[in-house]
């Protein structure tokens, strides 16, 4: 379609009286946001109704105007819910589409609705209302995931697995303890969500374009109607602030990073080289060429989508970094990254909350893996320290023993007491080691010995789960 073709008569736009020629069709499509900001329809109606109620209370519009506006908005809401509302590209955005339809339905009362406000404070209000509802939904789903982790952790509070550093076997832990680490991560995410909601739950409406309005408005009344905790204190900041959208995307980036770390482990654990878990078929897919394949697409996609959410954050930061006060058209570009982050986080949390309870744990495989790689070597060093040896000397002694076992292709528990003393270079100090050492060299003994708050002992894991359920 030719970029020089003009498709609009000036009168079609709310701002057209200033202009002498119609908008170029390509410009119209380039500048319109109705393709994506339809999502604001219900919160836009809610904001308009609250604004109209305040205008009537302040005698800025009549009671009849308010009644007409309420009646018209009810019909518009029904049309939207039924999929019968006709969105028009020529009207640019959700705000002017609804206002035009309202005026068509109720006449002059519809024209009075915009008294004392601008699309600048209107869209800022819509953004906060929409994001607040989204945050509340995400909070519920995040809680479901946290409960799922608690339930699985409780079931496997005594299931032994290898703990890793550098992806090398480090020390025995329990699977329940491992899951509780993710519970802690997601709990911090939940706390961040509460904090950011409290920060942005303030009303921009009343700031108008940027300087406020000459009408005797009552912003506090509108804030109460819409459930805000208060009003934005500066009209310039009210219309230009997008910190809340950036902060949500920052929260989302951290949360998705946690999801991605869990996803990476699920992918590893599901691989034949680990074989620690299995996932139900409904959370996996196959291959179009390899008949045997069962691919963990859900956690793999979650890893991939994490980068996408990072991109949403960078988009918003870049969008805002060079804007002078107050509102600029750049801010039309704030919505799609925010929508994408909300959708991605919500979908990811929902599927993980559904998937986590159905993780099939192969406890015997996990325990066997924990018994490899000299996972209890640190326990032997601690044992020697408790017998009176300095830690660095104990560390060196056990390192010699491990090296000897590697050369003999055996484990520490395969050695006799005399052989273990000799391997540690302690055969001349028999008082430092007796038969009780072997109980500590088992993975069960190692795990049970971590009897302190935050430790991996099953009793401590269960205590942590109990505290977590109380906090929830």
From Swiss-Prot:
This is Argininosuccinate lyase. Keywords: Amino-acid biosynthesis, Arginine biosynthesis, Cytoplasm, Lyase. Its EC number is 4.3.2.1. It is an enzyme of class 4 (lyase). It is found in: Cytoplasm. Transmembrane segments: none annotated. It comes from the Bacteria. One of its GO terms (molecular function) is argininosuccinate lyase activity. Pathway: Amino-acid biosynthesis; L-arginine biosynthesis; L-arginine from L-ornithine and carbamoyl phosphate: step 3/3. Belongs to the lyase 1 family. Argininosuccinate lyase subfamily. Disulfide bonds: none annotated. It catalyses: 2-(N(omega)-L-arginino)succinate = fumarate + L-arginine. It comes from Polynucleobacter asymbioticus (strain DSM 18221 / CIP 109841 / QLW-P1DMWA-1). One of its GO terms (biological process) is arginine biosynthetic process via ornithine. GO terms for cellular component: cytosol. The gene is argH.
């Amino acid at each position: 379609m030719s970029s020089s073709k003009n498709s609009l008569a000036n009168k079609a736009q709310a701002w057209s009286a200033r202009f002498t020629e119609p908008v170029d069709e390509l410009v119209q499509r380039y500048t319109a946001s109705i393709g994506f900001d339809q999502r604001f329809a219900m919160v836009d109606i809610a904001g308009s109704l609250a604004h109209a109620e305040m205008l009537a209370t302040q005698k800025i519009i009549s009671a009849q105007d308010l009644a007409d506006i309420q009646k018209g908005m009810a019909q518009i809401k029904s049309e939207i819910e039924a999929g019968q509302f006709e969105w028009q590209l020529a009207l640019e955005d959700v705000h002017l589409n609804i206002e035009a339809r309202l005026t068509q339905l109720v006449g002059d009362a519809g024209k009075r609705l915009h008294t004392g406000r601008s699309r600048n404070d209107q869209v800022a209000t819509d953004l906060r209302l929409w994001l607040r509802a989204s945050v509340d939904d995400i909070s519920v789903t995040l809680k479901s995931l946290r409960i799922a982790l608690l339930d699985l952790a409780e079931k496997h509070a005594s299931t032994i697995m290898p703990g890793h550093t550098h992806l090398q076997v480090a020390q025995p832990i329990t699977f329940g303890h491992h899951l509780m680490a993710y519970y802690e991560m997601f709990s911090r995410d939940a706390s961040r969500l509460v904090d950011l909601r409290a920060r942005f739950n303030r009303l921009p409406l009343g700031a108008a374009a940027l300087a406020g309005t000459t009408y005797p408005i009552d912003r506090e009344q509108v804030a109460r109607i819409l459930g805000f905790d208060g009003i934005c204190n500066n009209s310039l900041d009210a219309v230009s602030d997008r910190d809340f959208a950036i902060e949500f995307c920052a929260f989302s980036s951290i949360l998705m990073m946690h999801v991605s770390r869990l996803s990476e482990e699920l992918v590893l654990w599901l691989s034949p080289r680990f074989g620690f878990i299995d996932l139900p078929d409904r959370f996996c897919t196959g291959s179009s060429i390899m008949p045997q394949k069962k691919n963990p697409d859900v956690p793999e996609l979650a890893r991939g989508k994490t980068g996408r959410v990072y991109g949403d954050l960078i988009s918003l930061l870049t969008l805002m970094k060079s804007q002078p006060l107050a509102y600029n058209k750049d801010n039309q570009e704030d919505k799609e990254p925010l929508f994408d982050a909300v959708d991605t986080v919500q979908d990811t949390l929902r599927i993980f909350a559904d998937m986590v309870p159905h993780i099939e744990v192969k406890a015997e495989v996990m325990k066997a893996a924990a018994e490899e790689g000299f996972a209890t070597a640190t326990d032997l060093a601690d044992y020697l320290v408790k017998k009176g040896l300095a830690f660095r000397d104990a560390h060196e002694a056990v390192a010699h023993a491990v090296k000897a076992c590697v050369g003999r292709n055996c484990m520490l528990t395969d050695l006799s007491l005399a052989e273990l003393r000799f391997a540690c270079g302690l055969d001349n100090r028999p008082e430092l080691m007796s038969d009780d050492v072997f109980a500590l060299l088992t993975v069960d003994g190692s795990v049970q010995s971590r009897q302190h708050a935050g430790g991996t002992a099953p009793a401590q894991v269960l205590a942590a789960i109990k505290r977590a359920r109380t906090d929830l």
